[in-house]
Amino acid sequence: MTSQKTTAAQQKAAKAKYKGKNSRSSKSGRWLWFAVGMGGIAIVSGIAGALLAVSWESTPLQQAQLSPQEEAVFDGDRISGNGLQFSQLTRPVNILLLGMSVLPPDVQNAPPESKNLRYQPQINSFEGLSDVMLLIKFDPETKKIVLLSVPRDTRTEIEGHGLKKINAANVEGGPALTAKTVSNLLGGVGIDRYIRINVLGVSKLIEALGGVNVYVPKDMKYRDDSQHLYINLKAGQQHLSGEQALQLLRYRHDELGDIGRIQRQQMVLRALIEQTLNPTTLAQVPKILNVVKENIDTNLSVEELVALVGFGSRTNRSNMQMLMVPGRFSETHEFDASYWVPEKRAINKLMSQYFGLEAKTEAQSSVPGRLRVAIQDSTGSDRSQLRPLIKTLEKAGYTNIFISKPWGQPLDVTHIVAQAGDGDSAESVRSLLGFGEVRVESTGNISSDITIQVGKDWFQNQAVFQNSTRP
């Protein structure tokens, strides 16, 4: 497939292709951070009322004051239609979403109520470190939404400040420098708009949505008196309040650190997508908008918000793809701090496949023998029960197979996870097996290319595999 490089300059050419076109009526998806699952008429009336009938072209939620040079970092041209088509997304658009964790020492003028305390509370600001970083592509042509998680500890060049962890870019230069840093890391991808939401806003947002039903993979306990951060969650499927969900999102004290946290974030995002299919979410519009007003900073205009939410509200969950910047943990004593070291070649491949950038190297097909395939059992079965599955894979040329630790959540349907973003190879595995569901997300074994999370449907097919692998 011929790809087009969507640098900031070339996005202008790309959007000319889409300008003036109506979005197709079958566009699918759901936009998490604002009002996933909202119907068009309810969104328009709700936003117009909550934002006090401001001009559709204004940016009433923007709290940062950007200089002309900083504004130029973002492609400011239209992303929505004209006239009656204002709620339609007219071209692919990349949004940089930053989740902020801000403590009083991070700001020049901390709120009076945060002073003279014996701990450092989270405050309603956007000046601190980026705790969560996502590049989200809304694409009306493919009818897909792609979320790319950028680990906060990624080692990269921050213009004017040297090699640092990427989460420091916001402290050094706000959303514009962060966008420029992310773009440089990801091969020059154009970034159209930004959104910053702080920790206080995330908790309130999930609470306004009614909480979330999610599987907590293990008991989580953590205590930090200096911030009054207390995490106490039990393993298992359960309903979490906004505050409890925030605990799950922030927990990073396990063997995978920030990468494990990204995996849990993707699990929560997936759960929210499925949960908000319920039309009763419409009743939560006022609460959600209040959260947006108080805890959001974005250069999106009102009509752009409507267009994005309108597109998102019609996206099928199967068209939501969740990726992570490829890389590795730094070795002990390799650097002065621990980092996620990005892998440039893998990044180039991923950006070409999912964000339309020009491939810098010739694309190579994924040969089965080169793919690292992890198997995670969710059924609690004896490992010997997986032998027919492994033999079938080996017979088809998948020779680099390993058993990973079990997947804690019991699954009815096997998940074939494209851990490294190689959806085509995951589809090939699914076709070989004849059962399971492909998921493009980063919740599998981080050392794998493909992770097979075995569900109960394996038992329905096990006899067939046993017969086919007998000599």
Model-predicted regions and their roles:
Residues 2-471:
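Non-catalytic, solvent-exposed segments at the cell envelope interface
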